[in-house]
């Protein structure tokens, strides 16, 4: 008997239950992913059709580190800190400031941790001196030599006002619209040797050359008179001098055309054969004056890069030390139509520029203006800055009885010679000092906050306890003297031999 399957009806839900509609489906956010769509069909090329190859942009020249240029940045680390301290000090009446007020400028000095400011000031005895006025009142001021340097700097900048006006005119003549924001010019204030108050003095005294106009983003400086005699770049002047020198030397050499293009590279620059070929091809291009109209040049073209290199070359020629920060040049992208990769463009032309990565921000040097870390031609302001650097290098505790090395002897002799003549310096308040903590640690002997006894020195503006002038250096010298004395006594004495009480020698274990 076949078994029959009985299908029973499913019991209906009770009448009291309510049917709810199903919840809406959530939106699938991956619907637009390219992996979900089928790839386009491959199109076969016709026989003989040209194939398009992908071109990968690469830097023309690889950057190479050069120690002489990096040493220029390294030796100015302490000088930049001292100049920041000096700028804060000279903003006060009579150029005298209390240590309590100086504690409010820790962030401006790049000090994120608490340091003994008095110990920092005493590390530069040639620049600052700490004096006590009243009970628990400590103030600091410039030394007579540093005071004389500062006054000489102000006097020299006032005398060279005509040269500063010429630099501003040449800078405006190179711009596209012949106008530049004053805020952008302020970034190059120290590099060009402009006085601190140039906005209220130079910009308003010479309406026959330029005037202050209101722009979309603030006041700007606009050119009012074009002088064709100023529209000659430093590269053109150098080319004329080289051509005249070659004319004089041609009488000693057989006058015949060269069979190959000769590339003259600066001393110390080493390039591969391919890099030298690209540098030679760029040099063979016609020179484009930075003062010519460049509105028709297409961005990204070789002609535009030739013009941009000429503009950077001319700006660096106008600076005092023939160098500046790369960030300062990037502020003028709109005025000179610089490319977004300005740093890469400078690296691609090592025969003209050198980009140093030392410090917190990159610096660019005009290569032809330097020889072994030294400027070929130094202005009076640069000489005053070197005298200030000699003051910064004056040691706090000169070593006695120890023959100085040749480097220390040269530095000491140079400092003595420079101090006898008087001096000055240009400040550099725009340059980055985020690595100032490392410099302070080096100056203060690597001591952190916990290494100091905060009850003996200034901690902040609310600390009323007097500082201790006898810092760690004095105690360390005393310990060294005691140790040397003990060592000398032990060396002069006889060796101790173990004996019995009656004087008989005892065997050693």
From Swiss-Prot:
Keywords: Chloroplast, mRNA processing, mRNA splicing, Plastid, RNA-binding, Transit peptide. Residues 65-393 form the PORR domain. Residues 461-474 have a biased composition (Acidic residues). It is found in: Plastid, Chloroplast. GO terms for cellular component: chloroplast. The keyword RNA-binding applies. One of its GO terms (molecular function) is mRNA binding. Transmembrane segments: none annotated. Pfam families: PORR. Residues 1-56 form a transit peptide. Residues 402-431, 444-509 are annotated as: Disordered. GO terms for biological process: Group II intron splicing; mRNA processing; photosynthesis. RNA-binding protein involved in group II intron splicing. Binds specific group II introns and promotes their splicing. Functions in the context of a heterodimer with the ribonuclease III domain-containing protein RNC1. This is Protein WHAT'S THIS FACTOR 1 homolog, chloroplastic. It comes from Oryza sativa subsp. japonica. The lineage of its organism: Eukaryota, Viridiplantae, Streptophyta, Embryophyta, Tracheophyta.
């Amino acid at each position: 008997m076949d078994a029959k399957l009985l299908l029973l009806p499913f019991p209906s839900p009770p009448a009291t239950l309510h049917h709810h509609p199903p919840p809406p489906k959530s939106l699938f956010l991956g619907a637009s992913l390219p992996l979900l769509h089928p790839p386009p069909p491959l199109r076969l090329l016709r026989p003989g059709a040209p194939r398009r190859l992908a071109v990968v942009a690469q830097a023309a020249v690889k950057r190479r580190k050069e120690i002489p240029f990096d040493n220029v940045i390294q030796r100015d680390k302490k000088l930049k800190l001292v100049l920041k301290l000096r700028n804060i000090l000279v903003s006060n009446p009579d150029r005298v400031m209390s240590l309590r007020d100086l504690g409010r400028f820790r962030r401006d000095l790049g000090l994120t941790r608490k340091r003994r400011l008095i110990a920092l000031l005493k590390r530069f005895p040639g620049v600052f001196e700490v004096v006590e006025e009243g009970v628990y009142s400590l103030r600091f001021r410039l030394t007579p030599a540093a005071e004389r340097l500062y006054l000489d700097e102000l006097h020299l900048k006032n005398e060279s006002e005509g040269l500063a006006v010429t630099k501003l005119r040449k800078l405006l003549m190179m711009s596209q619209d012949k106008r530049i924001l004053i805020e952008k010019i302020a970034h190059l204030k120290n590099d060009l040797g402009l006085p601190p108050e140039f906005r209220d003095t130079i910009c308003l005294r010479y309406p026959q050359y330029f005037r202050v106009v209101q722009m979309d983003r603030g006041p700007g400086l606009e050119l009012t008179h074009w002088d064709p005699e100023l529209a000659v770049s430093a590269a053109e002047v150098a080319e004329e001098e080289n051509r005249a020198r070659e004319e004089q030397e041609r009488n000693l050499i057989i006058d015949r055309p060269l069979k190959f293009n000769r590339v003259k590279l600066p001393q110390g620059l080493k390039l591969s054969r391919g890099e030298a070929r690209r540098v030679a091809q760029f040099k063979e291009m016609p020179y484009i004056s930075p003062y010519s109209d460049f509105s028709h040049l297409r961005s990204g073209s070789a002609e535009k890069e030739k013009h941009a290199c000429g503009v950077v070359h001319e700006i660096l020629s106008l600076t005092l030390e023939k160098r500046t920060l790369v960030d300062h040049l990037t502020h003028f992208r709109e005025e000179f139509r610089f490319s977004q990769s300005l740093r890469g463009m400078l690296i691609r032309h090592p025969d003209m520029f050198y980009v140093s990565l030392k410090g917190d921000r990159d610096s660019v040097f005009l290569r032809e203006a330097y020889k072994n870390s030294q400027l070929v031609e130094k202005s009076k302001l640069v000489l005053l800055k070197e005298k200030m650097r000699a003051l910064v290098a004056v040691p706090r505790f000169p070593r006695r009885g120890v023959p100085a090395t040749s480097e220390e002897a040269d530095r000491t002799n140079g400092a003595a010679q420079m101090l006898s003549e008087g001096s000055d310096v240009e400040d550099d308040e725009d340059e980055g000092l985020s690595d100032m903590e490392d410099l302070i640690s080096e100056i203060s002997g690597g001591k952190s906050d916990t290494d100091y006894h905060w009850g003996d020195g200034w901690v902040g503006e609310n600390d009323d306890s007097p500082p201790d002038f006898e810092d760690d250096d004095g105690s360390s010298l005393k310990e060294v003297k005691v140790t040397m004395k003990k060592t000398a006594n032990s060396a002069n004495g006889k060796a101790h031999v173990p004996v019995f009480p009656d004087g008989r020698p005892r065997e050693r274990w």
